[in-house]
């Protein structure tokens, strides 16, 4: 029997549970914003960093396909969430919180990309997997 789907499902359960936990731990007030989806923002930035790091290791075949499916597809797929990002942005716009919405979109995209790049760089240069 092929356990690929079970690995992805198990990882997804772990990742989504972690996302829920992080979301509950984060305050809704952030910097000068009264309402900011800090939980979703945080998991997406953390997830970008981790996927950059693990993505490099996957390309270099440091771990097997099953672990990649479990961790990258499952855990990180469940942990990060583009759909919640879109919903959080829409809610900010509906409440006329335009500065928060713009800050959230720009911050998520810019810091997300930087997180991926830093994760990749660290995996490549400090783990010794070239």
UniProtKB/Swiss-Prot annotation:
InterPro entries: FluC (IPR003691)
Transmembrane portions of the chain: 3-23, 39-59, 67-87, 102-122
Example of a GO biological process term: cellular detoxification of fluoride
Naturally occurring in which organism (per UniProt): Helicobacter pylori (strain P12)
Coiled-coil stretches noted in the UniProt entry, renumbered to this chain: none
GO CC annotation: plasma membrane
GO molecular function terms noted in the UniProt entry: fluoride channel activity; metal ion binding
HAMAP family assigned: FluC
Protein name stated in the entry: Fluoride-specific ion channel FluC
């Amino acid at each position: 029997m092929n356990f690929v789907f079970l690995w992805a499902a198990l990882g997804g359960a772990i990742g989504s549970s972690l996302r829920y936990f992080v979301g509950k731990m984060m305050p809704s007030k952030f910097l000068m914003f009264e309402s900011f989806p800090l939980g979703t923002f945080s998991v997406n930035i953390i997830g970008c960093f981790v996927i950059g790091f693990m993505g490099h290791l996957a390309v270099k075949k440091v771990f097997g396909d099953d672990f990649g499916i479990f961790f990258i597809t499952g855990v990180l797929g469940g942990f990060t969430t583009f759909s919640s990002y879109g919903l959080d942005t829409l809610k900010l716009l509906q409440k006329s919180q335009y500065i928060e919405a713009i800050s959230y979109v720009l911050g998520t995209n810019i810091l997300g990309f930087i997180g991926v790049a830093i994760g990749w760089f660290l995996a490549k240069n400090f783990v010794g997997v070239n």
